[in-house]
Amino acid sequence: MASEDAPTADQQESRSLADATRRPSAREQVQARLDELVREHRFTIAVVFPLVGAISLVASAEGWYPDSLSFLAYNPLFVLFGVFVMRLPLIAGVGPLIDRKAGIALALLTVYAYGIEYVGTTTGWPYGAFEYTVPLGPMLAGVIPVALPVFFFPLVLNAYLLTLLLLGDRADNTAVRLAATVGAVLATDLVLDPGAVAVKFWAYECAATASCGYYGVPWSNYAGWVLSATVAVLAFDQGLDRTGLKARLRECEFMLDDLVSFVILWGGINALYGNWIPVAIAVALGVGLLTTDRFDFAIGDSALVRAVRR
């Protein structure tokens, strides 16, 4: 027998009508506009920006800018603008999932990121003694980029999303999910750090010794990344609703475009400097992306390409 509290057919119809006619909240309207913006400019964001970024960073490092354009060399506003644009697909993708719990997790992870980076730049632990050699925007205490979370969080979150897609149901096992994500984070840093050293973003004190045997990066750096990746993966795993994240991944085709940008930007820089192991890892990440069938739109759909054709 039906429960007395169960809604009648008329009540269900009224609720459905109310849902259909409900005015979207301001947040929902902003989210919808951001989704539309990213979809309209996918090729520009995921391909053009990292290509321009790679050329610009190499030109800065090698002194290729003429005097009239020297203001662009390592220009922090230029760098941060490019990074922010390339992050838009990820920001739009996770935006609907940021609730109070996720916000707390991100806040705590931000504190950790600043703290461990300060310890790293002042003591050499856990990444090895290093320093930023160009200002990546405003610096905290003169040693840490204020924009550090914008650089750090996406490395981990992209690895987390790629793991969920590639492993499928196997990612439901916590140990498998966390171990695979940490491994994916290490893979991205095996690409990032040699490229960043090549374009002189930062430098390790061991650069002139055998202990910096991986393209100017000490192997101890990666032990430090195991620690930070584990902390960050746990924060995302606990802070984000995984069921909602999987659903968003299914409906949001551009959610991993930031990883596409990463592969093009840092894979390209490493290729220009002949860092072939990082290039091979970047290619492997690209193959992983292709197997997820996430980047299959027609180039002609890009707003930039349509504008050029006019």
Tell what function each PLM region has.
Residues 1-54, 246-251, 284-310:
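Haloarchaeal acidic low-complexity proteome signature biased toward cell-envelope/secretome components but also
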Residues 27, 78-93:
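Central hydrophobic cores of alpha-helical transmembrane segments in multi-pass inner-membrane proteins
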Residues 39-43, 73-75, 210-228, 250-289:
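Membrane-interface transmembrane-helix boundary segments in multi-pass integral membrane proteins
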Residues 40-57, 105-110, 260-262:
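Alpha-helical transmembrane segments
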Residues 88-92, 96, 120, 125-132, ...:
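Internal transmembrane alpha-helix with an interfacial aromatic "cap," most often the third helix
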Residues 101-112, 165-188:
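Interfacial segments of alpha-helical transmembrane regions
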Residues 114, 118-122, 183-202:
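Transmembrane alpha-helix/helix-exit interface in multi-pass inner-membrane proteins
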Residues 134-150, 208-224:
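Short aromatic-rich membrane-water interface segments that cap or initiate transmembrane helices
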